[in-house]
Structure formats: structure tokens, C-alpha cells
């Protein structure tokens, strides 16, 4: 089998295609959650906390005063952007929770596999486990029905 045939077989396998679709949908879902956090969750939270815009929260490490995170970054000042980190953390928590709920629902619909039929039975004389088709116990040599 040539390299092209091997690649074609690999590329069209169900798992590869499923993975590609999952990555694309996951990327789009991440953008939706980021927008949800930035545009819907954080503004009311910032208002409750005294009109704080979390994306502008930072610690200035340069010692020079800056009015905003953008001004500090434009000046090349070293900063710790903990407000952006808070937004990212909330994004992660929401995504993790949604994925947990989706997987929980998917697992609810999965059918449990039927239990395997027993392949041994108990000898009524010595109580040892013997193969289901056995007519004589290998341990005590008693006849088994």
C-alpha cells in the first residue's frame, strides 16, 4: 500500500473526522462563551462591584503611573493583568461546567451493556467454581447436573 493510500485511509477514518469536527465546534463554542462572559456576565458584576471593568484591572510593576492597562502596555511597562486572568478563569469555569452537563446528559442516554452470561457454576458438593458445561467437578470429582 502506497503512502497516499495510507494517508487517505487515515484521513477518512471516523475518529479523525470526528476529532476535526469537535475541534472546530469547540473553537466556536469557546468564542461564544468568551463573549457571554465579557459582554453579559462581567458588566453587571463590575457594576455591582463599583463600576469596575475587570479587563482594566492590573498591577503596574514599573512604578510609573498609568491610567489604564492599554496605556501601560502601549508604554511597554511590565504589568500583571489580573483582570484579564479573572475573565479567562470565569470563561474556563463556564466551559468546564457546560461540558460536564453535556457529557452527563450523553451518559444518561447511553445504554448499559448487558451483563455477560455466567461462564461458571458452583459445584453443589464442594462449592468450587466449575465451567458451566462441566458434568463432573474437577475439584471433588462429583457428578454435576
UniProtKB/Swiss-Prot annotation:
Any one of the GO CC terms: plasma membrane
Major localisation: membrane
TM region(s), chain numbering: 16-36, 83-103
Entry membrane topology: Multi-pass membrane protein
Assigned keywords, A-Z: Cell inner membrane, Cell membrane, Ion channel, Ion transport, Membrane, Transmembrane, Transmembrane helix, Transport
Subcellular location(s) per record: Cell inner membrane
Annotated InterPro entries: Mechanosensitive_channel_CS (IPR019823), MS_channel (IPR001185), MSC/AndL (IPR037673), MscL_channel (IPR036019)
Pfam families assigned to the protein according to its UniProt record, in alphabetical order: MscL
Molecular function terms, GO-annotated: mechanosensitive monoatomic ion channel activity
PROSITE patterns xref list: MSCL (PS01327)
Family matches, as PANTHER family: LARGE-CONDUCTANCE MECHANOSENSITIVE CHANNEL (PTHR30266:SF2), MECHANOSENSITIVE CHANNEL MSCL (PTHR30266)
Known function: Channel that opens in response to stretch forces in the membrane lipid bilayer. May participate in the regulation of osmotic pressure changes within the cell.
NCBIfam families, per the entry: mscL, PRK00567.1-4, PRK13952.1
Similarity section: Belongs to the MscL family.
Subunit structure: Homopentamer.
Name of the protein in question: Large-conductance mechanosensitive channel
Lineage, top ranks: Bacteria, Pseudomonadati, Thermodesulfobacteriota, Desulfuromonadia, Geobacterales
Amino acid at each position: 500500500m502506497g503512502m497516499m493510500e495510507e494517508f487517505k485511509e487515515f484521513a477518512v477514518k471516523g475518529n479523525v473526522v470526528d476529532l476535526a469536527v469537535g475541534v472546530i465546534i469547540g473553537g466556536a463554542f469557546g468564542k461564544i462563551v468568551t463573549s457571554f462572559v465579557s459582554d453579559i456576565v462581567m458588566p453587571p458584576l463590575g457594576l455591582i462591584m463599583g463600576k469596575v471593568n475587570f479587563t482594566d484591572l492590573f498591577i503596574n510593576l514599573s512604578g510609573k503611573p498609568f491610567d489604564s492597562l492599554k496605556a501601560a502596555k502601549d508604554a511597554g511597562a511590565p504589568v500583571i493583568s489580573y483582570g484579564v486572568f479573572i475573565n479567562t478563569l470565569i470563561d474556563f469555569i463556564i466551559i468546564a461546567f457546560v461540558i460536564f452537563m453535556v457529557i452527563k446528559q450523553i451518559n444518561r442516554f447511553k445504554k448499559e451493556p448487558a451483563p455477560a452470561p455466567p461462564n461458571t457454576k458452583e459445584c453443589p458438593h464442594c462449592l468450587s467454581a466449575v465451567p458451566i458445561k462441566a458434568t463432573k467437578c474437577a475439584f471433588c470429582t462429583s457428578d454435576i447436573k
